[in-house]
């Protein structure tokens, strides 16, 4: 076991939703590039709004609904089905699924944690900024705050391997892979 330092690298995992994706969204809101009241399909035209089972009632899903987990999107996508259908990894296939999947509830009537909300926000950030979320966060957030060891793919910035396992289980090990949130 080694002592932790200011250069120790942790996996942010789902903390990246609030510490990066939400903050990057707010940066673009502050710059007038995104409006919280806008429908998601303003930025992702194929994104479908909520429609009641009988088709008589409709409700727009807004950017604000994604940030507050009130969109009605499911928590996760059917990973195995999506890999079989589109291959893995396939961000375009995932967004096709998110854009058309069944909504769990009418927007703004309930709250349910959803990774799909923040994957959708990632896509909005990338379309509006013309950069990947990783590039935008690094340039407009991490570097501005002097967070030199913060990144979505830390091995690119820190090849020293100064990593902390997030678990001390016998099976725990460092796993490098694609990020989705």
Predicted regions and their residues:
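Short, glycine/proline-biased beta-turn/loop segments that scaffold the active-site neighborhood
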Residues: 36-52, 144-145
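Short, conserved catalytic-motif segment at the N-terminal edge
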Residues: 1-12, 33, 49-50, 96-100
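Short, surface-exposed loop or secondary-structure junction motifs
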Residues: 51-181
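Generic hydrophobic/packing signal
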Residues: 23-29, 44, 67-74
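Active-site SXXK
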Residues: 11-37, 118-126
């Amino acid at each position: 076991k080694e002592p932790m330092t200011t250069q120790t690298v942790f996996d942010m995992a789902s903390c990246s939703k609030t510490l990066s994706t939400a903050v990057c969204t707010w940066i673009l809101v502050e710059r007038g590039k995104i409006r919280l009241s806008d429908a998601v399909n303003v930025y992702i035209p194929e994104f479908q709004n909520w429609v009641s089972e009988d088709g008589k009632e409709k409700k727009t899903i807004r950017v604000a609904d994604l940030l507050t987990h009130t969109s009605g999107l499911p928590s996760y996508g059917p990973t195995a089905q999506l890999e079989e259908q589109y291959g893995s990894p396939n961000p375009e296939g995932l967004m096709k699924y998110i854009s058309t999947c069944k909504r769990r509830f009418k927007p703004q009537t309930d709250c349910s944690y959803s990774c799909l909300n923040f994957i959708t926000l990632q896509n909005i950030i990338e379309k509006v900024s013309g950069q990947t979320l990783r590039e935008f966060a690094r340039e407009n957030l991490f570097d501005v705050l002097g967070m030199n060891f913060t990144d979505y793919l830390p091995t690119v910035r820190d090849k020293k391997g100064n990593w902390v396992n997030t678990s001390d289980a016998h099976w725990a090990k460092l796993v490098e892979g694609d990020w989705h949130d």
